[in-house]
């Protein structure tokens, strides 16, 4: 059976990095969040994809909110990509498609940024997995893409 390709956006992995940052500050072992544990336990079913956009959002959070040095962030990121054997997208060209989408529907800035993640998932022909329901709902509403999953739907798919 072939693996299901999943694009992991920032909110799918955010907790992992925040836990690592907090553990580093306290000098303790970090707890693996349930989402990440689920991904680890289901590696035989899924192929994972992430991108520079996820990395940038994670890095922004770790630098701004947790004062983590870039070299530490790079190590966290390298471990994350390696553990899940992910394909890493290091560049992507966006175009006027986002303008057309914002003309069609009202959305918050966060949702618009998540459309950039969705565009990468579309190019990779991967399921877009997000805990951000507005992006899922908006993409369905405008008929942009049909491989859209919440984390709960992903869990059901794994069963």
Tell where the protein language model's regions lie, with residue ranges.
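Residues that scaffold the ATP/ADP-binding catalytic core of kinase and kinase-like folds
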Residues: 15-17, 61, 138-139
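A generic structural signal for short hydrophobic patches within well-formed alpha-helices
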Residues: 13, 55-58, 135-136, 154
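Acidic, PIN/NYN-like endoribonuclease modules and their adjacent C-terminal/linker elements
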Residues: 1-7, 25-26, 118-159
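Amphipathic alpha-helical segments within well-ordered protein domains
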Residues: 59-63, 103
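Helix-adjacent hinge/juxtasegments
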Residues: 67-88
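A conserved hydrophobic position in a structured secondary element of the catalytic/binding core
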Residues: 8, 50-53, 94, 130-131
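Active-site neighborhoods of divalent-metal-dependent phosphate/nucleic-acid chemistry enzymes
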Residues: 85-137
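Short, well-structured N-terminal submotif of metal-dependent ribonuclease cores
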Residues: 1-51, 65-74
């Amino acid at each position: 059976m072939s693996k299901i390709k999943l694009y992991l956006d920032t909110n799918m992995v955010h907790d992992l990095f925040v836990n690592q940052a907090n553990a580093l500050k306290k000098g303790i072992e970090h707890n693996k969040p349930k989402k990440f544990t689920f991904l680890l336990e289901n590696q035989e079913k899924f192929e994972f994809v992430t991108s520079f956009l996820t990395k940038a959002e994670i890095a922004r959070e770790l630098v701004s909110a947790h004062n983590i040095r870039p070299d530490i962030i790079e190590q966290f990121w390298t471990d994350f990509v390696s553990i899940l054997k992910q394909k890493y997208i290091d560049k992507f060209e966006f175009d006027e498609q986002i303008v057309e989408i914002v003309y069609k529907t009202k959305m918050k800035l966060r949702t618009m940024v998540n459309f950039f993640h969705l565009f990468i998932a579309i190019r990779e022909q991967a399921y877009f997995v997000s805990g951000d329901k507005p992006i899922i709902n908006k993409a369905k509403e405008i008929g942009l893409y049909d491989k859209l999953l919440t984390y709960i739907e992903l869990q059901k798919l794994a069963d």
